[in-house]
Amino acid sequence: MTKLSRKLQTQKRHRRLRRYLIGDATRPRLSVYRSNNHIYAQVIDDSAQTTICSASTVDKELKEKSEKLPSDCNSSSIVGKLLAKRAIKKGIKQVIFDRGGNLYHGRVKALADAAREAGLEF
């Protein structure tokens, strides 16, 4: 039996998670995508199929403060705080966390912890 690549394992976990992670207007889904260099997070209303708010390490607001954010846990926590601030501004306090098939560790965990500290509940 051949071993699955890390990317295929992540995709398989994500498909399995998405079966039961469905966000709506009252409790939207906080989706996280992690690449090698950046991290992206967005709050999605699946019933209306719209993105309510988003934040990433390539965001204009973050680029103005610093030239380039490294791909580490500190950058992820900055993105988590920014996303929580934007979500609360739009009236969202509770979300469903979708880690996107990634393990809840490192940059994904840092983003989640920062969003919780900034006021989001999940």
Swiss-Prot record:
Keywords tagged on the record: Ribonucleoprotein, Ribosomal protein, RNA-binding, rRNA-binding
GO CC, any one term: cytosolic large ribosomal subunit
An MF annotation (GO) of this entry: structural constituent of ribosome
One of the GO BP terms on file: translation
InterPro entries in alphabetical order: Ribosomal_uL18_bac-type, Ribosomal_uL18_bac/euk
Signal peptide positions on this chain: none
Highest taxon, organism lineage: Bacteria
SUPFAM superfamilies: Translational machinery components
Pfam families, per database record: Ribosomal_L18p
Matches recorded under HAMAP family: Ribosomal_uL18_B (MF_01337_B)
NCBIfam families on file: L18_bact
Subunit structure: Part of the 50S ribosomal subunit; part of the 5S rRNA/L5/L18/L25 subcomplex. Contacts the 5S and 23S rRNAs.
Function: This is one of the proteins that bind and probably mediate the attachment of the 5S RNA into the large ribosomal subunit, where it forms part of the central protuberance.
Family: Belongs to the universal ribosomal protein uL18 family.
Name of this chain's protein: Large ribosomal subunit protein uL18
